[in-house]
From Swiss-Prot:
Species this protein is from: Paracoccidioides brasiliensis (strain Pb18)
Topology of this chain in the membrane: Single-pass membrane protein
Annotated function: Component of the MICOS complex, a large protein complex of the mitochondrial inner membrane that plays crucial roles in the maintenance of crista junctions, inner membrane architecture, and formation of contact sites to the outer membrane. Plays a role in keeping cristae membranes connected to the inner boundary membrane. Also promotes protein import via the mitochondrial intermembrane space assembly (MIA) pathway.
Source taxonomy: Eukaryota, Fungi, Dikarya, Ascomycota, Pezizomycotina
Pfam families linked to this entry: Mitofilin
PANTHER family, alphabetized: MICOS COMPLEX SUBUNIT MIC60, MITOFILIN
Record protein name field: MICOS complex subunit MIC60
Coiled-coil regions listed in the entry: 356-379, 405-456
Amino acid sequence: MLRTSIATSRQLLSSPVCPKASAQWLRSSNAGRANTTTRRYYAIQQEPNGALRSSLSPSAAAVSDVSQRASNSTNTKRPNTSDLNVRSPASPSTGSTLKPETVLVAPVSPLRQGQSSPGSAAPAPEPAAAPPPSPPPPPPAPKTGRLRKFLLYLFLTTGLAYAGGVWYSLRSDNFYDFFTEYAPYGENAVIYLEERDFRNRFPNATKKNNRRAVAPRDEGAQVTIPGGSGLSWKVAEEQQEGSDISKKGPHMSAVDNNKATKDTKTVEKTKGGVTSKSPAQKEEAVKTKPAPEGVKTQPAKVAETPREPAIPAITTIDHLVLNTEDEPVVQDLVKVFNDIITVISADAPSSFSGPVAKAKEELEKIGKRILALKSDAQASAQKEINDAHASFDKSAANLIRHIDEMRAEDATKFREEFEAERERIAQSYQEKINTELQRAHEVAEQRLRNELVEQAIELNRKFLSDVKNLVEHERESRLSKLAELVSSVAELERLTAGWSNVIDINLKTQQLQVAVDAVRTTLENSNVPRPFIRELAAVKELASNDEVVSAAIDSISPVAYQRGIPSSAHLVDRFRRVATEVRKASLLPENAGITSHAASFVLNKVMLKKHGSPAGNDVESTLTRAENFLEEGNLDEAAREMNSLKGWAKLLSKDWLADVRRVLEVKQALEVIETEARLRCLQVE
């Protein structure tokens, strides 16, 4: 920005406001290019020449404003080569709407006048016009942020889809299996939500599960009490054996031998860790323990009074026992209450003995009430059962009576229907018998009538034959001669009709033979292929009812009788031309290139032509044999020889083989037609 302001100030002080007219019109063409090459752009857009306007006079500012308006429609001047950073003043172009005469001339500032002496001959420099302001830089292209939007939408869509999948997994088991198997961390998310839902629905469930179970207290290590310690009524020698209290015995249990419950727990001493024995247990243990050998027990001289133990015996609360084995609900309630008693006995039995006793009484009352309710319910149920049995018995009796009545009615009805059906069947059979008898009488009468008619006819025939014999005998057999004459005339008529058919068949056969000869003559006498559609149509018309002739004509290719077939001489001449080309390509492989064609052409020049009937499957031998067959007139064998060629030789002779096939097809069809005509003549004879 500093360099631009300095260059602008220099341009204002050095260049005139209105340049010369000649320079304007001469440099107008190059002004646009110079302006585009020297124009500078900055990121921060500021008002051009703002600092300069503040320091210049108001007249200079006005001039700069006018020049700025004029520069919007004009091009800039090409910069001087001596200073590329200084912009040239604006020069009006031919298309400018502001004329140079309308530009205001800025007055000379006092500072410039003071610098020039009054007597100097040099004219004072004119104040320079304000340079054209640089056009505002184009606004920067707004950032589209497509990648940011795409990532944001993708993240939101993925999150919504994942949340929807978790939500739907809680509703559908099938989708739960799919989501937990394929979605990452899907199973953890679903399990977490299920746990949260469970905690919200059952807030007290976790508290019960988190309660620590009462674990048995650690009894510590085994403690051995010396033999001389403790109180005993026996002598000291008897304490040698069994001084270890870790062995099994009654002393291992610190509670009474109350066998009513199985869940009683021992209460241990918190600091000493050694269980104390009650006097009764000690006496019982001493009585059950056998005396060691060699030591004789002596009766105590003075009976010692039992002393109270240092630690008072622990009192326990008796368990609740109710005789309700057949009530599982009551038994479960008693079991739960006994468990509570066991826990209380282990902790502080004396504190809760009163409430427990009261609870026992209430539970006993509840048990008795339940038993009473059960007995009442059983009694009412038994009464209802008895009433139901009575009603069922009554209903069964009524039902049985009703069934018996219905059975009797059905039996009566069935008997009546049976009698009516029996009468109807007997009547129908009687009618059938009467009908059969009547028909038998009619048949017998008709048979007798027919026999009488036959006898009458036979008598009439005998009478006629007798009359005929008598007439013949009287007229000397004239009637028999007339009969013979009639039969002879009929035979002559039959023979005449048969010979007329023979004559017609012979005439058609001759006409067919003439038509076939016309076709053959047309084919043999034509030097060039000529159509023979009319001749073939005449043959088909004469043998319209003969299937063999029609099949032979249909076997001829339409191309053959529409375009004609070549003659034998034409085929021989064409064969010789084809044979020349085939010999040139006789040495070519199937996938031959230009080199192979050239080599085959050169080698063909030095090959010797075979004569006679050479043996072999090479191209030259095959061509020689085919040529011999053509000279003999055997087109069939020549075509067979040419058809045995392979590769380029067969490809080159393909057209010649097609012509030969058409010729052979036509000749074969004509031979079949001639044979059929001869066969007709033989059949007539």
